[in-house]
Each structure stands twice: as structure tokens, then as C-alpha cells.
């Protein structure tokens, strides 16, 4: 499924003694995905793929990935098809979708992780969509565990005002109009990551307007999935100031994973001396500087499997 090629020069992080290098991963759709490998100096027993949120480039996770590598974990970050350096055509011509991200991109990345770190235990850290789409991965059983951050159904009706009004405008007005006029959705204009391929944006809109997110597509555009088979342990982190992944929406997504043993932690940033974490700031080095216990939760979870 994957054909991995080194595409950049190796460099060693001065502070961490972490070898960081670029990788190109070919999916079974014959699409090239840009990726970065973080390799610690010692032998790797545990390796992690960081699956990104919708429209978020892999560089966003650099500090977090470096931190994990400093703690001895092998790490691989990547751009989904149509995002960042994995956009290889005019965006209006890109036919990527949320389904293709989960069914083709993420499995290819997991295969590449195994190629890079042989004889390790493999884990997935999912941010928002990166955790939602695991049930589309045919090789999900290679994962020993999952650590999800801000992962929920994103159901609009469960959001509080005024954020719900913003979400309704984005989903129900901007996406269909922009897709029709431009052939893609300029989500960056709303401060929501990179511009999105129209298929990604269209499915995002459809799924956030129904219960269970991806469950709304079962027996419609999705006829094969593994949500009722996945049984590896998972820790899901959420934060009380997250307008999207509120507690109700987290539970809505958790219910889709019918056999996954999930530990849910819904946390108040103020309990950690942090003013705000929301949907994105867990991965910020500034958050880690103020609340190191939060990143340590990921390390502790991953260590359980060693």
C-alpha cells in the first residue's frame, strides 16, 4: 500500500538529539503524501502516527512530535491529500474526501510507520478528524492504542451560541456557495485551517449536520467500515472551553465506536493554570510550558503499552 521515499535532508534537533527528516508516502490512490519522521537516538519500542484535524498541516504538530521523540517515541506526522505539501494539483481539481483520508491516507501512513520503525508497538494520536476517521482504516488492528484530542461528532445543534451561528454560516452557507463558485472551500478565510477540497468540505458539512458524524453516511456513501470492530484501548481528552468538541459531542462520537474501551477525560483548562485550550491549543508549546501535565498524559498513556 505504501512506497516511502526520503525526500529531504536529515537534520538533528539541537536540543533534543532527535533526527528529523522528510518522507513521501504513496497511497493506493497513487497520491503522494508529505510526511515528517521524528527518530530518537535510542532504539524505538513505541511508534506513533499523529493524525491531523481537518485542514491542519503537519507543521502544527512539530513541537509536540519533537517532545514525544525526546521521550523515546518514534513519530510520523503527515499532510492529508489536498492539504499543505500533499496538494499536488489545482485545489479545484482535487477529489480528496474525508472518506479517502480515512480509507487511503491514514492506512498508508500506518504502513509507512511500520516500515520506519520495525518491531515497535504502533499507536495513533488523533486530533479531531484524525480520531474520527480511524474506523475507515482496514489495517486498524495494527494499532495498540489510540489517544484522541478534541475528537467529537462536531454536531452543530449541540454547540452553544454564538459559536453555533458561526458554524452554521460556515457549514450551510460558505461551503455550498464556495464549492459551487470556486470548486473548493476557502476555510482559511474563517480561520479554520487550510483551504479544503470540495469533497472534504461537502462531507464535513453533511456529517456535522447529523448525529454521530460519520454515522450519517453509513449505508449511503460508506458501505464498509470497522467502527463496530475496533477494540483497542483509547484515551479521549476534551476541554471545557472547546466550542466544537464539547462533552455532548464527544459522547456522540464515542457511541459510534461500539466496542472500543474508552477512557474519557473532560478537563477544565483553569485547573491546569491555563486560560484557554479550546479545540487547538493542546498541541501548543505555550500550553505545555504552563501545563506540562497535559503532554505528560500522552507519554503516560503510551508508556502503558511498553
Predicted regions span which residues?
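Alpha/beta-hydrolase active-site loop
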Residues: 95-116
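Catalytic active-site module of serine/aspartate enzymes centered on a nucleophile-bearing elbow/loop
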Residues: 263, 267-306
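N-terminal cap/lid segment of alpha/beta-hydrolase-fold proteins
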Residues: 2-39
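Conserved alpha/beta-hydrolase
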Residues: 58-90
Amino acid at each position: 500500500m505504501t512506497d516511502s521515499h526520503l525526500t529531504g535532508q536529515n537534520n538533528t534537533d539541537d536540543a533534543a538529539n532527535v533526527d528529523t527528516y522528510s518522507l513521501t508516502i504513496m497511497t493506493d490512490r497513487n497520491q503522494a503524501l508529505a510526511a515528517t519522521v521524528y527518530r530518537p537516538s535510542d532504539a524505538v519500542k513505541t511508534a506513533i502516527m499523529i493524525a491531523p484535524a481537518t485542514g491542519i498541516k503537519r507543521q502544527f504538530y512539530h513541537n509536540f512530535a519533537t517532545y514525544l521523540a525526546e521521550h523515546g517515541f518514534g513519530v510520523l506526522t503527515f499532510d492529508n491529500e489536498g492539504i499543505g505539501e500533499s496538494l499536488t494539483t489545482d485545489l479545484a481539481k482535487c477529489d480528496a474526501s474525508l472518506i479517502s483520508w480515512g480509507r487511503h491516507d491514514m492506512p498508508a501512513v500506518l504502513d509507512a510507520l511500520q516500515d520506519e520503525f520495525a518491531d515497535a508497538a504502533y499507536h495513533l494520536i488523533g486530533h479531531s478528524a484524525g480520531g474520527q476517521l480511524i474506523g475507515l482504516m482496514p489495517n486498524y488492528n495494527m494499532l495498540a492504542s489510540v489517544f484522541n484530542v478534541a475528537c467529537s461528532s462536531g454536531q452543530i445543534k449541540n454547540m452553544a451560541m454564538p459559536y453555533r451561528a458561526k458554524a452554521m454560516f460556515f457549514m450551510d452557507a460558505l461551503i455550498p456557495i464556495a464549492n459551487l463558485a470556486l470548486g473548493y472551500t476557502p476555510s482559511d478565510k474563517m480561520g479554520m485551517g487550510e483551504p479544503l477540497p470540495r469533497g472534504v468540505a461537502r462531507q464535513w458539512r453533511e456529517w456535522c449536520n447529523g448525529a454521530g458524524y460519520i454515522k450519517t453516511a453509513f449505508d449511503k456513501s460508506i458501505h464498509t467500515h470497522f467502527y463496530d470492530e475496533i477494540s483497542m484501548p483509547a484515551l479521549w481528552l476534551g476541554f471545557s472551553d472547546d466550542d466544537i468538541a464539547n462533552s455532548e459531542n464527544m459522547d456522540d462520537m464515542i457511541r459510534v465506536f461500539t466496542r472500543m474501551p474508552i477512557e474519557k477525560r473532560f478537563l477544565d483548562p483553569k485547573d491546569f493554570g491555563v486560560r484557554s485550550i479550546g479545540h487547538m491549543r493542546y498541541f501548543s508549546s505555550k500550553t505545555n510550558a504552563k501545563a506540562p501535565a497535559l503532554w505528560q498524559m500522552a507519554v503516560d498513556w503510551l508508556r502503558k503499552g511498553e
